[in-house]
């Protein structure tokens, strides 16, 4: 696997935005780069500033709030954002659900709450993970399949220049089947 390190989300976007058109493989109706891994060194600097991204902070916040409700209903996003974007309208099933909604997947078996409790109880655990994709639910993914499969949380030591532990940091490893550049 190729692993790149970037200062922030914008630097990662800029790299892939410049690389995929030239090095990506024609795959189905897109360009793809497989087996990519990267680290964002400053995850709190997560806003992509490249104008090509056409990033809408209000929409991003609304979508995040929707996930946090745990509701798979596209209508819930509409109530938060003021409208239901076409992409989500197109992905709804017959009940108005977006089955790949991360929030409803996190809430399955209270996964997010369990991860927080695990890390509080034992910061050294390597079992603090959330499964987004559930193979038993594959028939529900008729209209949409989650891009993110799993998220693992690990507390790792932050080592200073002298080799001593300065602090602990929460590391998040995300495993995805697909990640849209746009």
Model-derived features: positions:
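Terminal, non-catalytic protein-protein interaction segments that mediate quaternary/complex assembly
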Residues: 1-182
């Amino acid at each position: 696997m190729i692993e790149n390190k970037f200062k922030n989300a914008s630097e990662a976007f800029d790299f892939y935005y410049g690389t995929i058109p030239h090095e990506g493989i024609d795959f189905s109706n897109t360009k793809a780069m497989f087996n990519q891994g990267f680290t964002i060194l400053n995850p709190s600097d997560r806003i992509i500033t490249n104008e090509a991204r056409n990033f809408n902070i209000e929409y991003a916040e609304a979508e995040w709030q929707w996930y946090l409700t745990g509701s798979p209903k596209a209508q819930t996003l509409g109530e938060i954002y003021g409208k239901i974007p076409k992409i989500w309208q197109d992905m709804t099933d017959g009940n108005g659900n977006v089955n790949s909604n991360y929030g409803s997947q996190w809430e399955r078996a209270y996964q997010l709450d369990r991860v927080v409790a695990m890390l509080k109880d034992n910061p050294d655990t390597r079992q603090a993970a959330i499964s987004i994709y559930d193979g038993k639910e594959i028939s529900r993914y008729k209209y949409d399949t989650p891009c993110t499969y799993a998220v693992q949380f690990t507390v790792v030591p932050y080592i200073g220049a002298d080799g001593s532990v300065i602090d602990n940091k929460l590391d998040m490893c995300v495993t995805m089947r697909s990640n849209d550049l746009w």
